[in-house]
Amino acid sequence: MDAMVETNRHFIDADPYPWPYNGALRPDNTALIIIDMQTDFCGKGGYVDHMGYDLSLVQAPIEPIKRVLAAMRAKGYHIIHTREGHRPDLADLPANKRWRSQRIGAGIGDPGPCGRILTRGEPGWDIIPELYPIEGETIIDKPGKGSFCATDLELVLNQKRIENIILTGITTDVCVSTTMREANDRGYECLLLEDCCGATDYGNHLAAIKMVKMQGGVFGSVSNSAALVEALP
């Protein structure tokens, strides 16, 4: 995929439209959001592993995200990381969410190989070393699927004057999709990098990507790590 440049406008080749829609792609107005790349979601002994899913599906995005992260760090783009987890006293954990997790054998707050499952401050809750934030990068701790719900993400984006959001992380069909929809409804121009996302079910991953593209890009556009790195101004 090639970059397209028109009179100081920059586009990433994407489907169903070159992104961003207006070509206003700059380090000062664009943020990379890396969603929930935590041991609990993609590491041995974590929440997803405890539920018996194939870890290779949620580990596949690690290397592509590393390449995107390195490129965007080098060019001075805003970097934001998210972590899903709950307070140690579980005061922010809905009863039905805990019930569902216990029902499938991985109760949130219960002891696990990486500490209490999806609990803030535990080893499994933290971001994996390969993608760990560096000084100056924002970390958003969230109690739910969406990165805007019960967090200060919107305030951070407004303070940084962000217009464009590039979404990566896991899982495509749950936390990434929810965050993309939340951002789109708030007027942010969104791009999903399909090889930088993963899900516990590959069919769900593909379905989530397909839904982004419907109706001319109802939630934004879709590209990949190679196209982004090649065209990034």
Curated annotation (Swiss-Prot):
Result for mutant: D36 to A/E/N/Q: Loss of activity
InterPro entries: Isochorismatase-like_dom, Isochorismatase-like_hydrls, Isochorismatase-like_sf
Sample GO molecular function, one term: hydrolase activity
Record-annotated active site: D36 (proton acceptor), K142, C175 (nucleophile)
Mutagenesis / variant outcome for changing F41A: 540-fold decrease in catalytic efficiency
Entry keyword Hydrolase: yes
Catalytic EC class: hydrolase
Keyword Hydrolase: yes
pH dependence: Optimum pH is 8.5.
CDD domains noted in UniProt: cysteine_hydrolases
SUPFAM superfamilies in UniProt: Isochorismatase-like hydrolases (SSF52499)
Residues annotated to bind biuret: E84, K145, I170, T171, T172, D173, V174, C175, Q215
Signal peptide interval: none
Effect of Q215D: Loss of activity
Gene3D superfamilies in the cross-refs: Isochorismatase-like
Pfam families: Isochorismatase
Highest taxon above the source species: Bacteria
EC number of the protein: 3.5.1.84
Known catalytic reactions: biuret + H2O = urea-1-carboxylate + NH4(+)
Description of how activity is regulated: Strongly inhibited by the sulfhydryl-modifying reagents N-ethylmaleimide and iodoacetamide. Inhibited by the substrate analog N-carbamoyl aspartic acid.
Outcome, altering K145 to A/H/R: Loss of activity
Keywords: Hydrolase, Plasmid
Role: Involved in the degradation of cyanuric acid, an intermediate in the degradation of s-triazide herbicides such as atrazine. Catalyzes the hydrolysis of biuret to urea-1-carboxylate (allophanate) and ammonia. The substrate, biuret, is formed by the spontaneous decarboxylation of carboxybiuret.
Family: Belongs to the isochorismatase family.
Subunit and interaction comment: Homotetramer.
Stated name of the protein: Biuret amidohydrolase
Organism lineage: Bacteria, Pseudomonadati, Pseudomonadota, Alphaproteobacteria, Hyphomicrobiales
